[in-house]
Amino acid sequence: AKVIRSGKVSPADPQAQEIHGSPPARVDGIVTTGDVVRVGPLRLTAFATPGHTEGSTSWYWKSCEGTDCRTITYVDSITALPLGTYRFADHPDRVAMFRKTIAEVAALECGILLTPHPAASAMFERMSGARPLEEPGSCKALADSAARRLDAALGKGADK
């Protein structure tokens, strides 16, 4: 909420050297893991997924068409993206935060998985019908990919 209120990127953000902030915005409330936000008939449950940013928040909810109900899970970006001179190897607390988030996402039964970067979860292929909309193990696959990217980011930092 601090970044949204101020519009200033946290210097601890791995992308801080490349992101130049945004206009400040009013924050009406803060959600934490387990909080439920109602949007019309939907009840969205928040869960923290820090890593890509410290305040990353993901959501899950049940959506029904008649008696056909599905769980939908939006997982915010869990990609380790160091920009500029940022080295994950120099920030063990951030690495631990990422690893905890990745493990939590891997354990989820996502139902229909949504991500902010469609390629991370084959969203376009699933929405077009080229792949099943709901794929068992989709959260584990997303987490495994994120773990590989984090390991690669750590490897890049180790040789400098």
What are these regions (language model features)?
Residues K2-V3, I30, V36, S77, ...:
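Residue-level preference for alpha-helix termini and adjacent loops
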Residues T57-S58, M123:
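Generic hydrophobic alpha-helical membrane-span motif
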Residues A1-A48, T53-E54, P82, R87-G111:
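Metallo-beta-lactamase
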Residues S6-V9, K62, R126:
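Residue-level signal for well-ordered alpha-helical positions
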Residues G66-D68, A80-K160:
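Accessory terminal helices/loops
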Residues A48-P50, Y74-D76, I112-P118:
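Active-site neighborhood of phospho(di)ester-bond hydrolases with catalytic His/Asp-centered motifs
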Residues S58-L81:
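Conserved beta-strand hairpin/beta-sheet module of binuclear metal-dependent hydrolase folds
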Residues E54-G55, A120:
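Short active-site segment of divalent metal-dependent hydrolases/proteases
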